[in-house]
């Protein structure tokens, strides 16, 4: 996996040793692999199960298993900085938008407008577009980035406002 903004040079600037919580994609992937029964803990070590060993070298099968675990089994709300619930949020619809509309670079506000009914968001922290963007960041774009299914525009970095980021399918 290649995770944007999680390159070794950047991570080791502040720490000489990294733990999973210092590296969110790894921490979540570890949890997903435990939940999907691809890893187990024994004597303080994470070891692959039979199913996990069977997936070694089969990137497509591993990606599909982690995708299912993330979008069907994991409580993504636990990883949100500002938990937001939208009654009309539908992950199947979100994934359809990604499949059909992210062939070229799409700015986050446009993606948010396609995924969520922005005009129906009446209670918000910053603005309807900002709240929808944060919601999609934790529930859709970040997981798909970590799974390698979409990419963030190369000119965007950690300091780029979420509303100014652009994404496309890989």
Located regions from the model:
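Leucine-rich, amphipathic alpha-helical/linker segments
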Residues: 58-115
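Short amphipathic alpha-helical interaction segments
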Residues: 20-35, 42, 127-148
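Accessory beta->alpha helical hairpin/"wing" motif in late/C-terminal subdomains of nucleic-acid enzymes
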Residues: 27-29, 36, 40-79, 151-170
């Amino acid at each position: 996996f290649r995770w944007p903004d999680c390159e070794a040079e950047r991570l080791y600037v502040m720490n000489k040793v990294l733990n999973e919580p210092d590296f969110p994609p790894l921490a979540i992937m570890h949890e997903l692999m435990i939940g999907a029964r691809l890893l187990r803990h024994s004597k303080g070590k994470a070891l692959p199960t039979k199913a996990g060993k069977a997936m070694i070298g089969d990137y497509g099968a591993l990606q599909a298993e982690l995708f299912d675990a993330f979008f069907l089994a994991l409580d993504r709300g636990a990883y949100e900085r500002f938990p937001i619930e939208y009654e009309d949020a539908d992950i199947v619809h979100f994934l359809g938008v990604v499949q059909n509309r992210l062939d070229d670079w799409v700015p986050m506000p446009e993606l948010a407008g396609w995924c969520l009914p922005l005009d129906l968001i009446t209670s918000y922290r910053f603005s309807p577009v900002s709240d929808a963007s944060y919601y999609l960041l934790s529930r859709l774009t970040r997981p798909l980035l970590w799974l390698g299914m979409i990419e963030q525009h190369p000119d965007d970095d950690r300091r780029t406002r979420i509303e100014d980021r652009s994404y496309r399918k890989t």
